[in-house]
Each structure stands twice: as structure tokens, then as C-alpha cells.
């Protein structure tokens, strides 16, 4: 951390290097910056790889206009989600007068400056990295069984002076399940006891990330190239029941980064930065998805008569 006193206030700058943030298996640079800078607050509301990225606050939660800080990658405005931790050399966090002096109005909520790796003179290096991540549901809801649900309905109706919706024999049928006797053996589909959360979702999801880096150079030429591939599969238990369509939450992204440095003369240098990213995502449904449907399934079918 660097704090310098100026006439109009203190200038704050925090610099984080690759060896600090690249110790965790993060999908992108946004997740690697958690807890890495004093005054840098990160908030993430969900774990969806495809559409949810953390929100950054450099001036605290009271940042002006609720705006995120300015993000620059090698001096150009870029989406931080397209940058992988492996390709980053350092990150600088500017706030207050330091950001405003450099970037004007765009820097009123601070600035995050990302510097990517570059090759070194007279060296050769190849690095391969593989991360395998098992994802868990931190707050998975627990559902009661059908019998407890039926008893709760009867109790609630009793408080309102209404008659019970389910007879004692029906509650017993729910409790015994399809392997029980009596009504449940005769009508297994009329008195089901199914935990739809367990039937729909599995306990874990899998993510894999592959990265290969080439760097080096000679006396007047330096290069750095990074190729990355990220794949993620969600928690849907049986996603391929429909022919030709998968209901799984899936996300994949391929990254390419190339930085070239050429010394044309002793005073003239040419730099070339190339960045490419290709991503694909799919999920079950749009306005309605499986996470919502497990809450709306009825405890039993409507009674039918001939």
C-alpha cells in the first residue's frame, strides 16, 4: 500500500502482484481480487458463471451514483471478466485524488489498473496450469416430506376454521410412500412422497480450467502468448432427458492473449497487444427455470372421477 499526503488530501494506491492473487482457483480476474486491496469491496450475488460478475466499490458502498470503478487493461477500458488471472502481472487500485487526477470524471469512483504479462529478453518459458473445481450449493433448501406438508395444510386450515383438506388415511398414505400398504399401494401416483429438490439437482457441479503460456524473447524481440479454456457444468441431475436439448447450466469460454514487444531502435519500441475471447452458455429456461419449479409442484394430483 502507498499513501502520500497532497495539498488536497491523501493519495491512495494499492498494488497487487500475480503471486498474491493467483493462489486461488478463480474463473477470472474479478474473483481473484477478493480481499486483495484495502478499501476495495467486492459483492457477488450469485454463482452463475455465465451472467453474474462481482460488483466492485473502491470508495465504499456509498460510491457516487452507485457506479463501479473504472477498469483499464493495459491502459484501455476492458471488461474484467474477459481477463484470466494467469495472464495478469499486477493490479493497481487507485482511489480519491489519484484516480481523479489521471482519469477525470470517470475516476470519481476509483480505478483498477490491470497490467498483463510480457516476455523477457533472452529467455524461453512454457507454463501449463490445470484447475479442477468441485462446486457445492452453500444454502440448499431442505423440503419436508409429503406427510408433513399435508399435516401443515390441515393445521393452517384449522386455524382459519376450515375443515381438514387431507383425511388421516391420506396423510398415512403420503407417509408410507409407494412401498407402503393400503391406499399408497393402490394409488402410488395419487399419494406421492417425492423430494423434488433431490430429484432435480445433484450435490456438486464440476468446473475445469486449462491454461498454457509461452513467453520469452531475444535481444530485440519479446513475446508472451496465453491460451485458456474454461468449462463449467451445473447441478441439474438428469439434463439429457430431452433428445437434442440439454437442460444443464453450462458455460464454456476460450481466451487468447498475445503481447509482442519489438525494439526498432534504441529509442523506439513497438508494442502489440492482442486479446480474444469466445464464450458459450446455456441454461434451462428463461423467465421460468428449474429452481423456481421445484417450489410450485403440488403435493398430489387433483382427485379425478369417472
Describe the residue ranges of each PLM region.
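Residue-level detector of conserved catalytic or cofactor/ligand-binding positions
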Residues: 1, 7-15, 299, 303-306
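Short, small/polar-rich motifs associated with maturation and membrane association
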Residues: 5-257, 269-271
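Face-selective signature of the C-terminal outer-membrane beta-barrel domain
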Residues: 224, 257, 261-284, 288-294, ...
Amino acid at each position: 500500500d502507498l499513501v502520500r499526503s497532497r495539498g488536497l488530501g491523501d493519495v491512495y494506491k494499492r498494488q497487487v502482484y500475480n503471486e498474491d492473487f493467483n493462489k486461488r482457483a478463480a474463473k477470472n480476474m474479478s474473483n481473484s481480487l477478493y480481499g486483495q486491496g484495502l478499501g476495495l469491496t467486492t459483492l457477488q450475488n450469485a454463482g452463475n458463471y455465465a451472467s453474474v460478475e462481482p460488483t466492485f466499490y473502491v470508495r465504499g458502498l456509498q460510491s457516487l451514483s452507485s457506479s463501479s470503478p473504472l477498469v483499464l487493461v493495459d491502459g484501455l477500458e476492458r471488461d474484467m471478466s474477459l481477463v484470466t488471472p494467469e495472464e495478469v502481472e499486477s493490479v493497481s487500485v487507485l482511489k480519491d485524488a489519484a484516480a481523479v487526477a489521471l482519469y477525470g470524471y470517470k475516476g470519481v469512483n476509483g480505478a483498477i489498473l490491470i497490467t498483463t504479462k510480457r516476455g523477457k529478453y533472452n529467455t524461453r518459458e512454457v507454463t501449463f496450469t490445470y484447475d479442477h473445481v468441485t462446486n457445492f450449493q452453500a444454502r440448499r433448501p431442505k423440503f419436508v416430506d409429503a406427510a408433513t406438508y399435508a399435516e401443515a395444510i390441515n393445521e393452517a386450515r384449522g386455524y382459519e376454521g376450515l375443515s381438514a383438506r387431507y383425511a388421516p388415511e391420506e396423510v398415512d398414505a403420503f407417509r408410507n410412500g409407494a412401498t407402503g400398504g393400503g391406499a399408497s399401494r393402490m394409488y402410488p401416483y395419487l399419494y406421492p412422497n417425492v423430494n423434488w429438490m433431490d430429484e432435480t439437482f445433484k450435490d456438486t457441479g464440476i468446473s475445469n480450467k486449462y491454461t498454457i503460456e509461452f513467453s520469452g524473447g531475444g535481444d530485440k524481440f519479446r513475446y508472451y502468448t496465453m491460451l485458456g479454456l474454461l468449462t463449467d457444468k451445473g447441478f441439474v441431475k438428469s439434463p439429457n432427458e430431452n433428445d437434442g436439448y440439454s437442460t444443464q447450466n453450462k458455460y464454456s469460454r476460450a481466451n487468447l492473449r498475445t503481447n509482442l514487444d519489438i525494439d526498432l531502435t534504441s529509442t523506439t519500441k513497438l508494442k502489440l497487444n492482442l486479446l480474444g475471447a469466445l464464450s458459450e452458455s446455456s441454461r434451462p429456461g428463461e423467465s421460468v427455470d428449474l429452481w423456481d419449479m421445484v417450489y410450485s409442484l403440488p403435493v398430489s394430483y387433483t382427485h379425478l372421477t369417472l
